[in-house]
From Swiss-Prot:
Pathway in which this enzyme or protein is active: Cofactor biosynthesis; 7,8-dihydroneopterin triphosphate biosynthesis; 7,8-dihydroneopterin triphosphate from GTP: step 1/1
BP GO terms, sorted: one-carbon metabolic process; tetrahydrobiopterin biosynthetic process; tetrahydrofolate biosynthetic process
Record carries keyword Chaperone: no
Record-given protein name: GTP cyclohydrolase 1
Family from the record: Belongs to the GTP cyclohydrolase I family.
GO cellular component annotations of the record: cytoplasm
Organism for this UniProt entry: Bacillus pumilus (strain SAFR-032)
Enzyme class: hydrolase
InterPro entries associated with the record: GTP-CH-I_C/QueF, GTP-CH-I_N, GTP_CycHdrlase_I, GTP_CycHdrlase_I_CS, GTP_CycHdrlase_I_dom
UniProt catalytic activity: GTP + H2O = 7,8-dihydroneopterin 3'-triphosphate + formate + H(+)
Amino acid sequence: MSEINKELIEHAVRDILKAIGEDPDREGLLDTPKRVAKMYEEVFSGLNEDPKEHFKTIFGEDHEELVLVKDIAFHSMCEHHLVPFYGKAHVAYIPRGGKVTGLSKLARAVEAVAKRPQLQERITSTIADSMVETLNPHGVMIVVEAEHMCMTMRGVKKPGAKTVTSAVRGTFANDAAARAEVLSFIKND
């Protein structure tokens, strides 16, 4: 993926401001195109990042039981409206063959996938599939819950409504008790 073209974004933001009847040269908006371009560089930084790279750090550990990192806060941008959605990701896996990854790597992978124009469903499945491809665990279960500003600010206007998605692979796809265990841990604070 190429670098974000901030100059092109600045011109586009100026055009949008003009199109909605604003004066992009007035004091409050004068630097807005630059600020938006800088923000887009940050919030879309995942476009240049492969989440699988985070799972290349492996620790040889004889552990083949559940590992769960829950409540990983994230934010992303809805690809349909380019407005934010944000929430928490819960990442669970059962390692296989001594392949345990660092806990921070799970959070970094969530960030890499979220920081791009995105759909919640794709975030969920991309994290799961990246883990399966690189770690070959017995099972992976990802649960993502998020509030979408496209449902809060426009259209149906339902603030507080949360969308929950899940992706289950391996053991979790076939074992209801294993899925229930993860869900019980997620619910407990």
